């Protein structure tokens, strides 16, 4: 038997040591307990903040806060303070003012940063502020508003204040308010009454607090959906004796105004912002084209490629939704009542079907019609398991959610703004935001596009407030074409765009003023 060489043994051991160091990343971890203890401490640190459903896990904390901070700062709203209604909590801002009701005034600093970020992409409103530093066209205006309360609308509200107006504000949607932004507005002195997750009773209470003031009488209304206008007509009709005009943003609210006008019950001029070119062709189309995907991804993590989706309605909102979904490889069906819109959908490459014909096979149902009961209980009963149902229209009437609140169906909240409605046989439908507006309830929207709409609203308020007697009668009006063009021109510098100027001869040939308007009122963009 041969005797091993000691020198060789040493070389072998050194070689094994080198290999162990070289490939140490492949070796099993043997000193994990210390790391695990440290990780457990980290989890305890994150779990110190309770939620309604118990302690929040580390991974869910990170996911929830990073996802929801854009919409409502979930890190704030998921606290034990949720158990106490803001109506029951006395709050004052740093100046001792208490004429507001928000979730938590302590969030104001964070909300101010959100507003400052939005201002960077809303340069048209900032330009309006600068141009009106000397002359304040809204001096004397007392504007009561009911819109979504987000960082973008906060820039609009503060612009109106900078132009001389006094404002009182509530939310037009119980889920779309950014609590930190509402707090920042309250800290700045705006009488704001809104928080995310209001009850129906809270919703009308907030509107009432904006209107029912003995020492403060509104003379302008800025509405989104018509709820504020409806409340004033129903509860305080005498307020309209001093109202100079109404500015309405949404198709739902505009429809209600035209109904009032047709019944000869509209007693003040109203400006239809929804059908202005700068709202229809930009906000309704481009905003929805980007935000529909954002809302669906944040709430459901859905994979779009290969999915079958039906979009109810092919107006500008429907067009934006369909374009976004088609680009990601979905099979898109469209339902329509209007043959012109239906033909547009066909020529854009979409199958136009009745909802009953595709309801069993689609994976996602999106409504954007502005109508009621577009998706009925019968449709919901026939949907496939795990079908996602959501709404991109303003009102929550498009999906018959009330029909789902019956004893035989079980509601299970699985995420913020995500409910599983479970049938007795185990089938479940995924309902987003309880049928309310998806993008502002569950995600966020592009700031630049909202700048266009907000600037249009500001100019409409200025026009109605300063219009001489007799210019506008008790009817619904579109924004003058010249103002639409002015709004567009304010946003062109962001793209370094340079307009071509007509020569005198060209202007004469076209029968136009060199400075616009450049299209007749009947022109379809």
Per-region residue spans from a language model:
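Adenosine-phosphate binding glycine-rich loop
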Residues: 66-71, 80-87, 92-99, 107-124, ...
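Glycine-rich phosphate/diphosphate-binding loop of Rossmann-like nucleotide-binding domains
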Residues: 146-165, 280-283, 287-372
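Rossmann-fold NAD(P)-binding glycine/threonine-rich loop
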Residues: 21-27, 39, 45-47, 53, ...
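Rossmann-like NAD(P)-binding element
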Residues: 215, 219-226, 348-405, 409-410, ...
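Residues in the short beta-alpha loop(s) of Rossmann-like NAD(P)-binding domains
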Residues: 173, 337-338, 395
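Glycine/serine-rich phosphate-binding loop and adjoining beta1-alpha1 elements at the start
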Residues: 78, 90-138, 169-307, 486
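Eukaryotic N-terminal low-complexity, Ser/Thr- and Lys/Arg-rich leader segments
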Residues: 1-97, 102, 525
């Amino acid at each position: 038997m041969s005797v091993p060489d000691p020198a060789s043994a040493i070389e072998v051991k050194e070689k094994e040591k080198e290999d162990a160091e070289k490939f140490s990343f492949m070796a099993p971890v043997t000193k994990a307990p210390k790391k695990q203890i440290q990780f457990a401490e980290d989890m305890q640190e994150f779990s110190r903040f309770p939620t309604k459903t118990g302690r929040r896990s580390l991974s869910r904390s990170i996911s929830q806060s990073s996802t929801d901070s854009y919409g409502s700062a979930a890190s704030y709203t998921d606290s034990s303070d949720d158990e106490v209604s803001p109506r029951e909590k006395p709050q004052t801002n740093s100046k001792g003012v208490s004429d507001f009701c928000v979730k938590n005034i302590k969030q104001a600093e964070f909300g101010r940063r959100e507003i400052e970020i939005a201002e960077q992409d809303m340069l048209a409103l900032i330009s309006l502020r600068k141009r009106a530093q000397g002359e304040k066209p809204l001096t004397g205006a007392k504007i009561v508003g009911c819109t979504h309360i987000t960082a973008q609308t906060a820039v609009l509200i503060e612009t109106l204040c900078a132009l001389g107006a006094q404002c009182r504000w509530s939310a037009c949607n119980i889920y779309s308010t950014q609590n930190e932004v509402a707090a920042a507005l309250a800290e700045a002195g705006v009488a704001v009454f809104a928080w995310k997750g209001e009850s129906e009773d809270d919703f009308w209470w907030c509107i009432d607090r904006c209107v029912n003031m003995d020492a403060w009488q509104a003379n302008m209304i800025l509405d989104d959906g018509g709820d504020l206008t409806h409340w004033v007509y129903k509860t305080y009709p005498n307020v309209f004796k001093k109202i100079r005009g109404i500015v309405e943003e949404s198709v739902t609210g505009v429809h209600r105004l035209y109904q009032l006008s047709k019944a000869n019950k509209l007693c003040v001029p109203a400006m239809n912002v929804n059908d202005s070119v700068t709202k229809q062709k930009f906000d309704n189309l481009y905003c929805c084209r980007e935000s529909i995907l954002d809302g669906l991804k944040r709430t459901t993590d859905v994979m779009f490629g290969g999915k079958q989706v039906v979009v109810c309605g092919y107006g500008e909102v429907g067009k934006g939704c369909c374009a976004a979904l088609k680009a990601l490889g979905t099979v898109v069906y469209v339902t329509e009542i209007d043959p012109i819109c239906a033909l547009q959908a066909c020529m854009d490459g979409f199958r136009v079907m009745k909802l009953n014909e595709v309801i069993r096979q689609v994976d996602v149902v999106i409504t954007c019609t502005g109508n009621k009961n577009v998706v009925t209980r019968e449709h919901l009963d026939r949907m496939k398991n795990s079908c996602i149902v959501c709404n991109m229209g303003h009102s929550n009437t498009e999906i018959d959610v009330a029909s789902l609140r019956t004893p035989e169906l079980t509601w299970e909240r699985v995420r913020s703004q995500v409910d599983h409605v479970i049938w007795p046989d185990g089938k479940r439908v995924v309902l987003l935001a309880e049928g309310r507006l998806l993008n502002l309830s569950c995600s966020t929207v592009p700031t630049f596009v909202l700048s266009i709409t907000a600037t249009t609203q500001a100019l409409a308020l200025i026009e109605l407030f300063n219009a001489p007697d007799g210019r506008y009668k008790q009817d619904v009006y579109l924004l003058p074409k010249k103002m639409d063009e002015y709004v567009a021109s304010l946003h062109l510098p962001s793209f370094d765009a340079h307009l071509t100027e007509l020569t005198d001869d060209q202007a004469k040939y076209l029968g136009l003023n060199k400075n616009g308007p450049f299209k007749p009122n009947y022109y379809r963009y």
